[in-house]
């Protein structure tokens, strides 16, 4: 599910993303404004290549795969609701798939649409989303807590680009080095979806308190050289464990006044 990003309406909230909408299901994730454009906007230029059937019966709807559709597209737009059922594929004389049969709710016809005009039939969540789990602007953050099995570190953030300051519970850190550390947090990669719930304790927990609330990112080591990522209580992604290993190392670099390592 994609929903309008209400952060756009709050002048006090600065987001690190320019997309107008966010993904709320199956996971919470910012959209990539470029790759999500067609999914959000093609409904306004939807043009069929042909009409297959006028006034189809229930039996005909079933024949075209529209009684149990391959996909359903539901848009809440200005002026009302638009619903499109996407059914079976149709092919040319050589068996090449050209598109799918579709039915627009309220218009009693079965249409034929080329595949490239109905992106909703093929899109996957990570195709249109940002790979970053969070894009919270650093100057809108009041605190960040990083907890591991061995330690807990609290950072207080104040100021904007002209007077940014950081206070750390474990000693002095420079503003520039902390910015580099936060950039590494932002790069936490949503490399694959993982929706299976787990009650395993987190190996690393990052809590970000900002103008519009709190985000909690938990990293839970798996048994396949990957790490489960739980975002705000929802198991959502997996990433390579190499990232979390480097994250712990970079926390040490930050506290020791050393440069971050960007690769993993």
Predicted feature residues:
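Secondary-structure "cap/kink" motif recognition
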Residues: 1-264
